[in-house]
Amino acid sequence: MTAIVGYTDGHTMVLGADSAAVTDRLLIVCEPHKVFTSGAGLVGVSGGLRIGQLIRFQGAPLELGDDGPVPSLLRWIQALRVGLGPAGVLRTKDGIEELADSRMLVGLAGRWFEIDSEWQIVEPASPYWAIGSGQLIALGALHAMASWMAPRHPRAKVTAALHAAAMYDPGVRAPFEFVERPVP
């Protein structure tokens, strides 16, 4: 359970996350560092905390190649698959290799990409996106802000979306953490 929220205004990319770690019967507010920088990108991981730790500390850095963000992400995903295999966090289901119960939100070159557990890359058309159990609440808050709020720094919008998710999703909790990067 979590909320990972990204927003860009075309100048700055901000990625934020809550601090809840949830088990079957327990919610722990901790320092999980669900969002971090990796090379040229911003990365947020929902699902198992161990997967996020492995990607953050042992994963290949995400580098932006001359061929653009999607080919760069494909190379990074392949490097992650090779590196994460020995860690035991990949599984095969119906002949498809999966990242066990996790998804990622990646910011690269001013764009957001969701990478699901089957390594599929989806690029939303909006300048914002969210993943985790608080996804729908955060997306609703971001949509409402985009349509009526005066321009605000992306961090203010991400913070408001995280507060909305924490208010209405029992698996999302403050404090929130943020990483940001200028758009190249």
Language model: regions and residue ranges:
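Conserved short S/T/G-enriched processing/targeting/catalytic segments and their helical context
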Residues: M1-E97, P124-A156, V172-P182
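Long, charge-patterned amphipathic alpha-helical coiled-coil/hairpin "stalk" segments used as oligomerization
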Residues: E97-I131
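Short, conserved aromatic-histidine micro-motifs
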Residues: R155-P170
